[in-house]
Amino acid sequence: MSESALPRKNNAYNRFLLLVAGLGGLLYGVDVGIIAGALPYLEATSGLNAGQLSIVVAAVLLGSVISTLFAGMLADWMGRRLVMTLSGILFVTSIPTIALAHGYEPLVLGRVLQGISAGLIGVVVPLYLAECLTPDSRGKGTAIFQWLLTLGIVAAALVGIYFSFRVDEVTKLGDPAKVLAFKDTAWRSIFWVSLPPGVLFVIGTVMVAESPRWLFRRGRTEAARAALLRSRAVAQADAELGEMAAETAKRSTGERVKESLLRRKYVIPFVLACIILACTQAVGINSIIAYNTTILLQSGLSDVQAHWGYVFFTIVNFLMTFAGVMLVDRKGRKFLLSIGTTGLFISLLAVGILFSRAESRRVDSSRAMQAMVGAGQKLSLVYDHKTADTLLTAAGKAGQAAADQATSLIVIYSYGDFRAATPVARSDDAMAKPVEINRESCVPANKVVAFFSNPFGNLEAARQAPLKIENALITPVPGAGNGWLVAISLLVYA
């Protein structure tokens, strides 16, 4: 029965189901995309080193991997609707955990919660749609989930650029303390803004019915029929109940598929599909999204320009997802896969060449910086044009960068067996905090963290070891033209 032939109340409920599923996709997209806009401000104000920041970024993927492994099991045990509600609650909980965080551990915890939420949503919402929607609406439900997932990434980028404009306005006032305070407010606010969709998703999941197939498998036939009647006419609901009963009868009589799934014609396509899926992740799509703004900043764009580049990237990603769904049946999977793979190769090659060209003028001034280390085995450095010129001169590279050209500095240092890196500092950022190098930001506070940092490291020795500057890399910041070339290359990637 077509959707138009259903009673009005059934059509309204089906639209509500699609809305709730769409909110699930939107949350998934926000989970993936929100960190890119917040990361530059988090890096500038949190005092975390580069390794800690990378873990904050990657924690959402860790949570997603963990929850994806158990999502199906939880959905069978607790029910589809309850797991969706749980995923929404986890997302809502993660926002204040992150936005109110004053330290490394709460940030990681909040990001892990976001990842767990995303993993549950990514598995359970499509499963729920497949079991609840009428056959002629299932394709629409899957498409809406995927479109709103990419739209969630766009929304996260738009939130980021709004706060980028605000930061730019405060920067023009010329007060470093106010700029630092507002950057701290900015990254927290970016996460707060993503809270309302999570609340709406939780409310929506409470209002929908449980999956009729899950209810039927639990022996709750009348509840399953009631759930079906919310989205179907009586005749169609009874017909689907009959199909469920027939499937159950087949299983109870011990009827099995006679052909082995381990035959060559099944195994090879399965292995190839797994390899292709693994390769789509190995090309770094999640990292490109999470670090998009940071990549564009390092390629030569200003803060506002970098956020615009991220907005363009997410919009192209959204449009290409729409185009892919429209063309997949017309042009075929192989054609789209070939086009996409070619685009990825060209994009990554172009970005690599552009960064390689910029970094060919990189200078290591580690010896000069090591000489600055005092008796306390720590170092605080205001990195500006004068400091850059001093370090370059000491490294025998005087004049490597023009007097008015911005340079970036990243310091890799160690205490004993433990290493860390400073966030990237720029000589043209008069509002930036000093580069701080100390034992607390490198040596783990306890043995548990030390094990994950370096399983073979000697923690007690590191607490007494002197500071060693391993690399102090000064790189001329490319111009905006180079930055826009990188942005265009990333659009091809999208």
Where are these regions (language model features)?
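Transmembrane-helix signature of 12-pass secondary carriers
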Residues: 1-494
